Amino acid sequence: VKLIYFNGRGRAEPIRMILVAAGVEFEDERIEFQDWPKIKPTIPGGRLPIVKITDKRGDVKTMSESLAIARFIARKHNMMGDTDDEYYIIEKMIGQVEDVESEYHKTLIKPPEEKEKISKEILNGKVPILLQAICETLKESTGNLTVGDKVTLADVVLIASIDHITDLDKEFLTGKYPEIHKHRKHLLATSPKLAKYLSERHATAF
């Protein structure tokens, strides 16, 4: 398995995390922005991330669309729930997280002053409402993770998005949203591989 993306977390991080949590070894190829114009014509659809999977016969399957890739990997490794009800809750959480990500994306590729202004607007606007909705979903769980105590794609996309919010304001979550803090603690305790990956992850701009 080879994952190709820029040298950042961004849209590829949930894919990296689900691969790590599933125990799948993969090549993490990172492209610098200055090299992208040369490489872009060789990428299907001209967008990243993509994943290349080589089967036992040596045939290579190229996959695009970050969430579709993450869902494919999660389903393959039984991380999309054991019942229809669990599947619904996982998809509900993914949708709630995507709402948070839509707000975060407003801050990307902006000059520092404008980014700071937009960050304050979203952190004082929609984000608290969206995070509270996520907390309500976590409260409904029968365990410590999104569905019970089993790691799923919902858990991975949630902590990846929370890291983006923390990037905008390191103190934003302090003393608030206890369910989100509890969720992260239990996720890392449940998945030592993921905890190790996060502890060793290099800091990047996004």
Swiss-Prot record:
Uppermost EC category: transferase
Key word Translocase present: no
Residue positions binding glutathione: 5-6, 11, 36-40, 48, 50-51, 65-66
EC nos: 2.5.1.18
Reactions mediated catalytically: RX + glutathione = an S-substituted glutathione + a halide anion + H(+)
CDD domains listed in its UniProt record: GST_C_Sigma_like (cd03192), GST_N_Sigma_like (cd03039)
GO MF annotations in UniProt: glutathione transferase activity
Entry keywords, A to Z: Transferase
Disulfide bonds: none
Superkingdom as given in the UniProt entry: Eukaryota
Gene Ontology biological-process annotations: glutathione metabolic process
Miscellaneous comment: There are at least two isoenzymes of GST in S.japonicum.
Function: Conjugation of reduced glutathione to a wide number of exogenous and endogenous hydrophobic electrophiles.
Similarity remark: Belongs to the GST superfamily. Mu family.
Complex formation: Homodimer.
Protein name from the UniProt record: Glutathione S-transferase class-mu 28 kDa isozyme
Source organism of the structure: Schistosoma japonicum (Blood fluke)
